[in-house]
């Protein structure tokens, strides 16, 4: 089980119940989703938040430098999962699905009024624990570079995007990805290499020259796997349970802010029209 969160308020208990007598490795993505979809199992949903939360929060923070916006987007992503869990077709690829939702939600949140670039620079300073202020122009440039990179990752064919999400954004080894996806290790490595080539070529067409080594480093950046505060994880789990209580219960759940509701509803509508 991931060590990125230090649960409290019962969060640890539901995870302990799920993993009692065994390891999280033995519980497949598909089985966790099935358990939640079938019986709204709190422990199963908590495990999904624990397993994929660092990637989701990392993406939200890279695209939304305001931490409150990122937290809202994080909760909205898992609320969408709770509402759509029963209809997921390729449950073993939920990481790829969550990445797509996280990117969509974060980009929608960017359209709302947000902090100035100078404020964004201060946020980055705190996160990186840097003693000197950051150049606002550099912050704006990095923000746009991140947006371009994630836009192009989102445009990759699924067979190339999936290993990028699993290996780079979630930090799994080639062997772990191969076991998860039921692919030969050579296929994982080959598709990652092809994904990098496609990304580099597409970014260059947009006027962004990215050396191969730099691209690999950017994709595997540690901040793409952010430690999830236990309070935030608990709110996401509570929101997921509220979404499963009844078709309308999630709209009035105390655990949900107006922003989280709006972002999740917008994402679901966008997914409907994209079908």
Summary of predicted features, one role per range:
Residues 27-32:
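Acidic, Ser/Thr- and Pro/Gly-rich low-complexity regulatory segments
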Residues 41, 61, 86-90:
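Short, flexible helix-adjacent loops and helix caps
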Residues 39, 51-54, 63, 165-172:
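Short helix-capping/turn signature of helix-turn-helix
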Residues 34-58, 68-71, 82, 151:
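A short, charge-rich alpha-helical start-of-domain segment used by transcription regulators
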Residues 4-21, 26, 67, 72-73, ...:
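Hydrophobic topogenic segments
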């Amino acid at each position: 089980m991931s060590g990125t969160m230090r649960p409290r308020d019962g969060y640890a208990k539901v995870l302990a119940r799920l993993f009692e007598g065994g390891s999280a490795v033995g519980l497949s993505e598909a089985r966790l989703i099935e358990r939640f979809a079938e019986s709204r199992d709190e422990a199963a949903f908590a495990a999904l938040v624990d397993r994929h939360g660092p990637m989701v929060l990392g993406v939200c923070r890279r695209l939304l430098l305001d931490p409150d916006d990122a937290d809202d987007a994080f909760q909205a992503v898992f609320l969408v999962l709770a509402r759509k869990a029963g209809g997921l077709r390729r449950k073993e690829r939920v990481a790829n699905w969550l990445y797509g939702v996280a990117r969509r939600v974060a980009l929608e949140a960017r359209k709302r009024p947000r902090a100035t670039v100078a404020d964004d620079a201060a946020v980055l300073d705190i996160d990186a624990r840097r003693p000197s202020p950051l150049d606002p122009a550099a912050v704006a440039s990095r923000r746009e570079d991140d947006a371009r990179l994630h836009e192009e990752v989102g445009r990759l064919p699924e067979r190339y995007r999936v290993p990028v999400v699993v290996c780079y954004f979630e930090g799994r080894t080639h062997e772990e990805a191969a076991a998860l996806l039921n692919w030969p290790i050579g296929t994982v490595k080959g598709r990652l290499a092809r994904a990098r080539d496609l990304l580099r070529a597409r970014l260059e067409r947009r006027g962004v020259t990215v050396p191969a080594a730099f691209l690999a480093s950017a994709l595997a950046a540690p901040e793409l796997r952010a430690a999830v505060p236990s309070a935030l994880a608990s709110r996401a789990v509570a929101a997921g349970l509220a979404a499963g209580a009844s078709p309308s219960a999630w709209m009035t759940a105390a655990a949900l802010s107006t922003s989280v509701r709006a972002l999740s509803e917008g994402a679901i509508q966008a997914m409907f029209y994209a079908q």
